[in-house]
């Protein structure tokens, strides 16, 4: 039973990603653009703040993000995770911070208010950047919630590789560099909390 409790934090986001993928692509209730991040649409349609992470443009996109969740799970196990809901806490904390960064970049830095964005990769790279610092320095608490992450050189090296690959991958066509950078910065901020 304890194993199942620990896995819930990874099963829930994976299930939501698969469920929305099936609803959008096989049932046709929504279009991807109806639920995606859209800078100018966030004010009138705030549900997009929650929905865009769980929407994916195609099956390969979905699988690559599910692979990221599996990597996060492996790393949490090797960091001797004490809090069985840490990944869910990180999702809840990363989402608004990442959305804020994207909104600022899109509306004030690059003035691209029609920017559309989907996918879980911003949360994944945000979690990777959080784990990079946690594996280097250790992290006992987030907002007075005990998490008890210990230093781990193996995870530090793994996160360095995955974050580097994530940044390089961001320069490919149709991949959101701003989404990945916002995720990385959000993970660093959460580490500081």
Label each residue range with its predicted role.
Residues 2-193:
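A detector for small-residue-rich transmembrane helices and their helix-helix packing motifs
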